[in-house]
Amino acid sequence: MFPFSYPADDRWLLPEGIEELLPEEAERLELLRRRVLDRFAAWGYRLVMPPLIEFIDSLLTGAGHDLDIQTFKLIDQASGRLLGIRADMTPQVARIDARTHAGDTPGRFCYLGSVLHTQADRLEKSRSPIQFGAELYGHSGRASDLEIIRLMLEVLTTAGVERIHLDLGHVGIFRGLARQAGLTGEQEGELFSLLQQKARPELTAAVASLDIDPPLARMFTELVDLNGRHGVMERARECLSEANAAVHMALEELAVLAERLGDCCPEVPVNFDLAELRGYRYQTGVVFAAFVPGYGREIARGGRYDDIGKVFGRARPATGFSADLKVVLRLSGLGESFVGSGEAIFAPAVSDPALIAAIRELRDAGRIVIEALPGQQGDAAAHGFRSELRRNGERWCVCPVASKDT
């Protein structure tokens, strides 16, 4: 028995950041879910359903500190071991690929399900996203990065999201400079944090305190300003001309990827942001994010993380993206195309085998039929229906509902 109880007026409250969906929004979300999964299937991505809860050592293996602090933890009453409620499905899919996908052929997986966070997103204020995404394992070339980005853009467009623009970055640029400078893990972490904040004065001071060559110090600080569209790659090649081969290889990968995106998705503006390092601790190459005007953060993001399966005994090249279905729904145009009760057909409370057969035939054809209950007050018009079943001789036919004003 609980040592306390809530006042009766508070029992309907949900925990902070936990939402429920009422019928209209839930039905729109389900419509979007089907569209997303159908689009994944059309590209050959096979649906997997990882468990909501796992042993913590499996759930967080190779995932990093950020995911650890976002994960709810509890004790398994059956085994006594520590469990975690998933906060991100990406490591789970990596485990599935490592354990079940035989051979070296590419593995294409998609997923969609609820995740839970200990801390709310600063913009959405939610701790219960519905995460969906796609992962491509077993190919390390630019073609797989391009495929995943194209898939992400197509899924968002299919969902009704408009005016998408894309940001591209590459963690190999910062990582290459850090290796060239011989930074310790602590020093690298400090510069990483300042770059994410785009805090140029603090970054300049931090770099000045390190014992590194002036050209390297300059390259670190100039990363903050290497963002935008036209001319960014030319400026980057000039600013980073004294960087090592790994940095130049990363720049070339970005340039080629942007060129190919321009060929296949010319309607999508592409921006570069060489200080963009989200997921730096486990991502290994290209990183990308989709944005729309008027929304203060990305609506989908992803990148390459070739080492994520190593801890499961099989390190395969990997790239993928993820997004929150609830965020995409809010930014999509599905509200206008939603099929609500106005499109349903009203059936009277009449015991007639012919009526039952007519209702079954309509439902088999994909129509919505709502049957009145005995004693129910109000006719079809009173309940807002535009169509109803009426007897016409021996048959029941769908007829328009006369307006209450006529």
Swiss-Prot record:
GO terms for cellular component: cytoplasm. One of its GO terms (biological process) is histidyl-tRNA aminoacylation. Keywords: Amino-acid biosynthesis, Cytoplasm, Histidine biosynthesis. SUPFAM superfamilies: Class II aaRS and biotin synthetases. It is found in: Cytoplasm. Gene3D superfamilies: Bira Bifunctional Protein, Domain 2. Its main location: cytoplasm. It comes from the Bacteria. GO terms for molecular function: histidine-tRNA ligase activity. InterPro entries: aa-tRNA-synth_II/BPL/LPL, HisRS-like_core, HisRS/HisZ, HisZ. The keyword Amino-acid biosynthesis applies. Pathway: Amino-acid biosynthesis; L-histidine biosynthesis; L-histidine from 5-phospho-alpha-D-ribose 1-diphosphate: step 1/9. It holds the Pfam family tRNA-synt_His. This function is generally fulfilled by the C-terminal part of HisG, which is missing in some bacteria such as this one. Belongs to the class-II aminoacyl-tRNA synthetase family. HisZ subfamily. Required for the first step of histidine biosynthesis. May allow the feedback regulation of ATP phosphoribosyltransferase activity by histidine. Heteromultimer composed of HisG and HisZ subunits. This is ATP phosphoribosyltransferase regulatory subunit. It comes from Methylococcus capsulatus (strain ATCC 33009 / NCIMB 11132 / Bath). The gene is hisZ.
